[in-house]
From Swiss-Prot:
Its EC number is 2.3.1.129. Belongs to the transferase hexapeptide repeat family. LpxA subfamily. Disulfide bonds: none annotated. Homotrimer. It comes from Sinorhizobium fredii (strain NBRC 101917 / NGR234). One of its GO terms (cellular component) is cytoplasm. The gene is lpxA. Coiled coil: none annotated. This is Acyl-[acyl-carrier-protein]--UDP-N-acetylglucosamine O-acyltransferase. InterPro entries: Acetyltransf_C, Acetyltransf_C_sf, Hexapep, Hexapep_transf_CS, Lipid_A_LpxA, Trimer_LpxA-like_sf. It is found in: Cytoplasm. Pathway: Glycolipid biosynthesis; lipid IV(A) biosynthesis; lipid IV(A) from (3R)-3-hydroxytetradecanoyl-[acyl-carrier-protein] and UDP-N-acetyl-alpha-D-glucosamine: step 1/6. It catalyses: a (3R)-hydroxyacyl-[ACP] + UDP-N-acetyl-alpha-D-glucosamine = a UDP-3-O-[(3R)-3-hydroxyacyl]-N-acetyl-alpha-D-glucosamine + holo-[ACP]. Involved in the biosynthesis of lipid A, a phosphorylated glycolipid that anchors the lipopolysaccharide to the outer membrane of the cell.
Length: 270
């Protein structure tokens, strides 16, 4: 279904069954598959491929060369309908690729709202991305990766499958992220190691200095304490019940995960 207010270039292909919302703009040489839903105001500039069971939220803009909704690249991929859901007001730049999920793990790849994907970044099968995230050029997310709100991943960084990147974490360019990165953490290098807190990001987000100081103290207690990371975190939990960002870090550490935790030293720890 294509509404009358949509503008589709005659050189593009919209297959029967696709749902095209109000004021959608599709430039030349795009291909929209039969199971695609484009929300109101979505814009495909040119040479964009949107296939699979893909839903794109209103106001999202996609640049040339992007391939959105292709099958999972997992060697265990089954030829069963799976989905990709992209939220509202995302910007998806040139050459970006995003895959649908796998039936073995729920079947859906989810991308939130207001995210920026720079050129040639990749979102693999079954990833879960929050809101207001930036993936810089050539960032690679393997399957089942979780990226929480307001995280920033520097150019060329690569994230191992099943890894979690916490809220407002900052990943330096060309870093190899093999283990979970705590909220507000900064990680750099290959192999990636924690290099402290994303204080600049916390300041820009409006956290006051006493709160940032408290989170720094919590960070030191967790990673410089006498026991394991998780034991240290559990031991100091009651000290930070009134400090939401510190509690986000502590809750993140306490949660179940398939990966160990990134630390200031090489190698993941628990």
């Amino acid at each position: 279904m294509v509404v009358s207010s949509a503008k589709i270039h005659p050189a593009s292909v919209v297959e029967d069954g696709a749902v095209i919302g109000e004021n959608v703009k599709v430039g030349p040489f795009c291909h929209i598959g039969p199971n695609v839903v484009l929300g109101d105001g979505v814009e495909l500039l040119s040479h964009v491929v949107v296939i699979g069971r893909t839903t794109i939220g209103k106001g999202t803009k996609i640049f040339p060369g992007a391939v959105i909704g292709g099958d999972s690249q997992s060697v265990h991929h089954s030829a069963v309908d799976t989905t990709l859901v992209i939220g509202e007001n995302c910007t998806i730049r040139e050459g970006v690729t995003m895959n649908t999920g796998t039936v073995e793990h729920g079947g859906t790849t989810v991308v939130g709202n207001n995210n920026l994907f720079l050129a040639y970044s990749h979102v693999a099968h079954d990833c879960r991305l929050g809101n207001n995230i930036i993936l810089s050029n050539n960032v690679m997310l393997a399957g089942h990766v979780t990226v929480e709100d307001r995280a920033i991943l520097g150019g060329g960084s690569a994230v191992h499958q099943f890894t979690r990147v916490g809220k407002q974490a900052f990943i330096g360019g060309l870093s190899a992220v093999s283990y979970d990165v705590i909220p507000y953490g900064m990680l750099n290098g290959n192999p990636g190691v924690l290099s402290g807190l994303n204080v600049v990001g916390m300041t820009r987000a409006g956290f006051e200095r006493p709160v940032i100081h408290a989170v720094r103290r919590c960070y030191k207690q967790i990673f410089e304490g006498p026991e394991s990371i998780r034991a240290n975190a559990a031991a100091v939990r009651d000290e930070y019940l009134d400090c939401p960002p510190a509690m986000e870090i502590l809750d993140f550490i306490a949660a179940e995960s398939d990966r160990a935790l990134s630390s200031p030293n090489r190698g993941g720890k628990g």
